[in-house]
Amino acid sequence: MTDESIASGIATAQWPGRLERLSESPAVYLDGTHNPAGARELLSFWEENLGDRRILLVYGAMRDKAVDEIAGLLFPRADAVILTQPRQPRAVSASILAEMTNHFAKSSFVVSDPLEALDRALQMASPEDAIFATGSLYLVGELRAHWGQQKQAPTPAVSGQLHR
């Protein structure tokens, strides 16, 4: 195996659920960020790639995650946050998430069902906006499965780059 073939493999690698772009207009991304380090990377992606684009954030998390720190990093940059809950016993309910994190958000909504939360974001979005669903790999998995049944196949967000 040559260095070139290794570099080529890395450049074309895709990691489902990690900055995975599902559509263009509006841009819809799935990102399994569930810890502060991942939130910082997602925030860097926003700063480097989105400029002043409006961001709608669909967020759901597990009880054992650093929700307060993640929300403190991501929510202030999002124009609207839609709080939801993955269908897992360890998930924080959307209403409790709201109590914990509303002070970080410019605007927030509670939509407990993840599929309805994504639909709400799509209804709120203009073609130029970016929607990100994040906070839990379980949430990303649910939305990815639903999107695959309802929409087009996903495309990589950033060709040739691995994130995390």
Regions found by a protein language model. Name each.
Residues 27-29, 68-130:
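C-terminal helical cap/extension that packs against the catalytic core
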Residues 86-90, 152-164:
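Short, flexible loop segments at boundaries between secondary-structure elements
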Residues 1-80:
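Nucleotide phosphate-binding/pyrophosphate-handling subdomain across enzymes
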Residues 46, 50, 101, 125, ...:
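Active-site catalytic pocket residues across diverse enzymes, especially alpha/beta-hydrolases
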Residues 139-141:
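Short, active-site-adjacent cap segments at secondary-structure transitions
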Residues 136:
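Active-site-proximal loop/hinge segments that shape catalytic or ion-binding/gating pockets
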